[in-house]
Swiss-Prot record:
GO terms for molecular function: glutamate N-acetyltransferase activity; L-glutamate N-acetyltransferase activity. It is an enzyme of class 2 (transferase). Belongs to the ArgJ family. This is Arginine biosynthesis bifunctional protein ArgJ, mitochondrial. It comes from Vanderwaltozyma polyspora (strain ATCC 22028 / DSM 70294 / BCRC 21397 / CBS 2163 / NBRC 10782 / NRRL Y-8283 / UCD 57-17). It is found in: Mitochondrion matrix. Keywords: Acyltransferase, Amino-acid biosynthesis, Arginine biosynthesis, Autocatalytic cleavage, Mitochondrion, Multifunctional enzyme, Transferase.
Length: 441
């Protein structure tokens, strides 16, 4: 059998993702501490348990979360959702996260196991119903409650909490499974009142990424004072434009959760939906969530490319997003990207079967499709389809150059409206099959 030289070269391209995407320092919000340990759930002895806690007691913290829409919701998802509803998104002081076991499809015993862990943390904090449980790992296995409980004791009794960079980096490491690098993002922003506020986020995920909220976990904390209803609205808006706009393999997990806590440690006027600063905060959180979500795609299992799919001039944002998602989830598009094949027919096919809310968003005689180079090289744009007509004389050499980039963009102009949406995806390689074929062994 003759081997494909181009694919061999592609597979051999080595990128040190840890060096590229893991920060060396950061800024962190007031009033939060994190602690992590190796409880023994992971067979390799790596960190597998982390706790985020709020130490600001001057006001009740606001909390919000967006959960998986998978019908088989994991026990920690069910429990966390109920707690947030019962407490109207206020007074959440901790999140306990274990990796290595998803506590999913475990029935009532899984619910009880999750409740045991949060009760343990609450007892350490001297509170009641103020902790949310989160889990990630293998589906269908019961939680190792004894090991994790001992890990909780170790974190609290040995005061393994900290608010420095290393503590946060270890926290990010503790929630990893098949991730090749921990995902940590920090940012500081100002509002017109002159005060500065801080956002810190961690995430895990490399496979099973096709959220409507996969296995994907994300946590954002801030010292901004904000009403819980406003926080929920902002997080939903941000998630719909970030974590719900990423795809690695098209699988949706049972455990997906994006959670945000705002403790108001910077004591300024509380923000609500009517505040002048509301839209600015929404934009800040959305941009921040996009940075964090993109790291998940950059760590896509076995991936060699990070691809932005931008759909412009649609009748609605929703239809632009549906088309971007359809392209991003197409295995034929993903494999063509890996093979550096400028197969625009696969892109058009994915656009054509997208289940649009408004069929008028797509007019096949107006559509334009291009590859966009992101490295500054010229020509930046390689047109594949113009006003619905395929460009039969494509510069194959230029196409190969663009498709050889680690970062590139697929641009789609529908020409039917003014709305736009973006999705972030990656290619699918031989290594993806190897990683997931060997996952439980």
């Amino acid at each position: 059998m003759k081997l494909n030289t181009k694919l061999l070269q592609q597979a051999s391209k080595s990128v040190d993702k840890y060096a590229l995407y893991v920060p060396k320092n950061g800024v962190f919000p007031r009033g939060f501490q994190v602690g992590s340990t190796a409880s023994g759930v992971k067979k390799n002895g790596n960190l597998d348990l982390g706790i985020i806690r709020n130490t600001n007691t001057s006001r009740p913290a606001a909390a919000a979360a967006v959960f998986t829409t998978n019908k088989f919701k994991a026990a920690p998802v069910v429990v966390s959702k109920q707690i947030l509803e019962d407490k109207n998104g206020t007074g959440i002081n901790a999140i306990v996260i274990n990796s290595g076991c998803a506590n999913s499809v475990t029935g009532e015993v899984g619910i009880e196991d999750a409740k045991k862990l949060i009760s343990h943390v609450d007892s350490k904090l001297g509170t009641s119903m103020s902790t949310l449980p989160m889990s990630t790992g293998v589906i269908g296995q019961r939680l190792h409650v004894n090991k994790i409980s001992k890990g909780i004791d170790e974190i609290f009794d040995n005061n393994k909490f900290g608010s420095d960079f290393q503590s946060w980096l270890d926290m990010a490491k503790s929630i990893c499974t098949t991730d090749t690098f921990p995902k940590l993002v920090t940012s500081r922003f100002s509002l017109p009142n002159g005060e500065k506020y801080t956002l810190t986020g961690i995430a895990k995920g490399a496979g099973m990424i096709c959220p409507n909220m996969a296995t994907l976990l994300g946590f954002i904390v801030t010292d901004l004072p904000i009403k819980s209803s406003a926080l929920k609205s902002i997080l939903t808006h941000a998630t719909n434009r970030s974590f719900n706009c990423i795809s690695v393999d098209g699988d949706m997990s049972t455990n997906d959760t994006i959670c945000m806590i705002a403790n108001g440690a910077v004591e300024t006027k509380e923000i609500d939906e009517t505040s002048q600063e509301y839209v600015q905060v929404q934009n800040q959180v959305t941009e921040f969530a996009q940075q964090l979500a993109q790291l998940v795609v950059r760590d896509g299992e076995g991936s060699t490319k990070f691809v932005t799919v931008k759909v412009q001039n649609s009748l609605t944002f929703e239809d632009a997003k549906i088309i971007a998602e359809s392209i991003s989830n197409s295995l034929l598009v993903k494999t063509a990207l890996y093979g550096q094949d400028a197969n625009w027919g696969r892109i058009l096919c994915a656009i054509g079967y997208a289940k649009l809310d408004n069929l008028k968003s797509l007019n096949v005689d107006k559509i334009n499709v291009s590859f966009i180079a992101t490295d500054g090289s010229e020509p930046k744009e390689l047109k594949l389809v113009v006003n619905g007509v395929p460009q039969l004389e494509i510069d194959e050499a230029r196409a190969s150059e663009i498709l050889n980039l680690n970062d590139l963009e697929i641009s789609v102009d529908l020409g039917t409206g003014t709305e736009e949406a973006q999705f972030w995806t990656c290619d699918i390689s031989h290594e993806y099959v190897t990683i997931n074929g060997d996952y439980r062994t």
